[in-house]
Amino acid sequence: MSSKDNTCPPPGPGHINGFHVPHYAFFFPHMLGGMSXTGGLPGVQHQPPLSGYSTPSPATIETQSTSSEEIVPSPPTPPPLPRIYKPCFVCQDKSSGYHYGVSACEGCKGFFRRSIQKNMVYTCHRDKNCIINKVTRNRCQYCRLQKCFEVGMSKESVRNDRNKKKKESPKPEAIESYILSPETQDLIEKVQKAHQETFPALCQLGKYTTSFSSEQRVSLDIDLWDKFSELSTKCIIKTVEFAKQLPGFTTLTIADQITLLKSACLDILILRICTRYTPDQDTMTFSDGLTLNRTQMHNAGFGPLTDLVFAFANQPVPLEMDDAETGLLSAICLICGDRQDLEQPDKVDKLQEPLLEALKIYVRTRRPQKPHMFPKMLMKITDLRTVSAKGAERVITLKMEIPGAMPLIQEMLENSEGLDTLGGGASSDAPVTPVAPGSCSPSLSPSSTHSSPSTHSP
């Protein structure tokens, strides 16, 4: 039998792969490209046979007639007109759209979202009626948040937005793996080292007590006040040294370094002294070993702030924190883009992000059975700010009650010039004495060298 006998006859002109053309030609026009000219539809010009199927270009429209085929280009689609929004209702900057119920810029949208999600508590240092515009919006967070509420921004919109995102992108219920990357491990070690070098642990101290004002509360014991003033001054110096060792801190502008140090000084002082709390004795120990009970802390100058500080110290979270966690939480308190008057808040936020991630992974690795410990630690920042706001009020009261020169802690909280010598100055191991309002404190310069290891903070 010849090879011709083994070859199947080609399908008829009215068939394509076994299907009758009239039934499918209009549903599968691309199949027509493989047909011969004699088997096509009448009046329609066809392309030569191609290997496989050919698809008409989407850029053309085929207009069929009984005599010819015309190729007409598609008219171009005009681009949509850009939407124009009213200026930001909060600061009058250029709006990026409607956010949380009102026309707002990206800056005010992000500020409002962070404030609500983190339950931030702000304080106005003026009359609670600051002008908020594009230029002044970062100067007073309290008034900026109030302006957000006044123009109609909604808390519920922030919460609903978070819930909506959770529903739209559900995460698998598989257990997350918290493995420290080399970069995160290195960051934790650097922060822990910075903390330990500037704040010795309670077990390293030789504790001693004093009989001054140990039994009865008085308005102020001058001897204890003098001692506390000396120790708080050393604490501030050590806080500056701690900040200088944090990765990226010295890359910020000098003005932002000053702002962050002044804003977080009292937060860190309170957090640190609370980690030296001994619950069974109800005492706190300073870095030179001085141990004071609740009554003595009151008489040393804490006054009505005393019970707030002891209540914070007696919570489970501060009692369970180790050096790495205390250091990371202190760094997060310090490097915070929500502080007022920052020149580069976005850069500060970017420096804070790896610290937050490091704390989260470290806490969950250390306590796999307590998944809520990390958010509880972050909530302590809000508590700290509440206590430190009361502390700032107490400092102002003490300034009026005690005549003469101010200790450094009062200068930092009261006088905007207290840290303005950051660009240069003496070494921080130089003797520090109380300074008068309006003078500078070269010992606090983050650009200066480290102080000697023998000087400890409270």
Curated annotation (Swiss-Prot):
Span of domain NR LBD: 183-417
Assembly notes: Heterodimer; with an rxr molecule. Binds DNA preferentially as a rar/rxr heterodimer.
Pfam families: Hormone_recep, zf-C4
Similarity field: Belongs to the nuclear hormone receptor family. NR1 subfamily.
GO molecular function: DNA-binding transcription factor activity, RNA polymerase II-specific; nuclear glucocorticoid receptor binding; nuclear receptor activity; RNA polymerase II cis-regulatory region sequence-specific DNA binding; zinc ion binding
Residue segments, region Disordered: 39-78, 419-458
GO biological process entries: cellular response to corticotropin-releasing hormone stimulus; central nervous system neuron axonogenesis; DNA-templated transcription; positive regulation of neurogenesis; regulation of transcription by RNA polymerase II; retinoic acid receptor signaling pathway
Biological role stated in the UniProt entry: Receptor for retinoic acid. Retinoic acid receptors bind as heterodimers to their target response elements in response to their ligands, all-trans or 9-cis retinoic acid, and regulate gene expression in various biological processes. The rar/rxr heterodimers bind to the retinoic acid response elements (RARE) composed of tandem 5'-AGGTCA-3' sites known as DR1-DR5. Required for primary neurogenesis and for anteroposterior neural patterning.
ZnF (NR C4-type) residues: 88-108, 124-148
Skewed-composition ranges (Polar residues): 52-69
Residue spans binding DNA: 88-153
UniProt GO cellular component terms: nucleus; transcription regulator complex
Motif 9aaTAD, residue numbers: 407-415
SMART domains associated with the record: HOLI, ZnF_C4
InterPro entries: NHR-like_dom_sf, NR_DBD_RAR, NR_LBD_RAR, Nucl_hrmn_rcpt_lig-bd, Nuclear_hrmn_rcpt, Retinoic_acid_rcpt, Znf_hrmn_rcpt, Znf_NHR/GATA
Keywords, ordered alphabetically: DNA-binding, Metal-binding, Nucleus, Receptor, Transcription, Transcription regulation, Zinc, Zinc-finger
Subcellular location: Nucleus
SUPFAM superfamilies, per the entry: Glucocorticoid receptor-like (DNA-binding domain) (SSF57716), Nuclear receptor ligand-binding domain (SSF48508)
Note on domains (UniProt): Composed of three domains: a modulating N-terminal domain, a DNA-binding domain and a C-terminal ligand-binding domain.
Annotated region (Modulating), positions in chain: 1-87
Source species of the chain: Xenopus laevis (African clawed frog)
Identification of the protein by name: Retinoic acid receptor alpha
